[in-house]
Amino acid sequence: MRIVVLGKELEYDFFDADLLEKYEKENLRVKERIQEPTQYDGKTTADSLRIQCGIVNDFFDEVFGKGMSEELFGGKNNIKDHMEAFAAVADAAMNCNGELTALTEKYSPNRAERRQAEKQNSKNFNRNAAYHGN
């Protein structure tokens, strides 16, 4: 899937189990690290933003490959850019999750059984209609 992040087009396959696992692991890691309160003790707001930007940098380097954060952010610690970039990837993952759910429902055994039953009922209806002169 193509994801546009800060004007740069990235590619990631959320349907590949190994890549999805890496994304999910790093996404959870971002959440845990950002919510760790002790790292902000005694820090200025600017230092806190640098910490958060560093966490997002680590995410991009782990998920998309070493150096991706530098490519995207150019060494800057702009929290707005970092959060928008992270959100773009999260949105893409959620869209793929919706597609995956639709795919699994479409091809689930229960649905296949229902379709077969509907098909059989349709055949029976058509036979009955022909027999009764309808």
What are the residue ranges of the model-derived segments?
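C-terminal charged interaction modules
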Residues: 70-134
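Short, surface-exposed loop/turn segments at secondary-structure junctions
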Residues: 38-47, 71-79
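Arginine residue identity/basic-tract feature
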Residues: 2, 29, 33, 50, ...
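Short N-terminal mixed-charge amphipathic segments
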Residues: 1-46
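Short amphipathic alpha-helical coiled-coil/interface segments
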Residues: 52-57
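Short acidic, glycine/tyrosine-flanked loop/strand segments centered on an H-E-D-like triad
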Residues: 65-66
